[in-house]
C-alpha cells in the first residue's frame, strides 16, 4: 500500500486528490482525530512506530514522506 492510498482511505478522499502538498490545512477531513488514525494506519501498513513528537509533526503528505524516507521506506 502506498502513502497516498493510506491517507486517502483514512481521510475518505480520492487517492488522486492526495499529493505531497496535501496537509491538515488543505484537506478538511484531516482533523486531530483523523490525524491519529492516519498515523496508526501508517504504522500498521509499514510496520513501524512513530514517536509522539514526530507523529504530531507529520501534518502533510510531504512531511510524512520525509519521515518514511529517513527510515529507508519508499512510499
Where are these regions (language model features)?
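Phosphopantetheine-dependent thiolation modules in NRPS/PKS and related acyl-activating systems
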Residues: 1-40, 44-75
Amino acid at each position: 500500500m502506498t502513502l497516498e492510498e493510506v491517507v486517502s482511505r483514512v481521510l475518505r478522499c480520492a487517492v488522486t486528490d492526495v499529493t505531497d502538498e496535501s496537509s491538515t490545512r488543505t484537506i478538511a477531513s484531516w482533523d486531530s482525530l483523523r490525524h491519529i488514525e492516519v498515523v496508526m494506519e501508517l504504522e500498521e501498513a509499514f510496520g513501524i512506530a512513530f514517536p509522539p513528537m514526530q507523529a504530531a509533526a507529520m501534518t502533510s503528505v510531504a512531511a510524512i514522506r520525509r519521515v518514511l524516507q529517513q527510515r529507508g521506506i519508499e512510499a
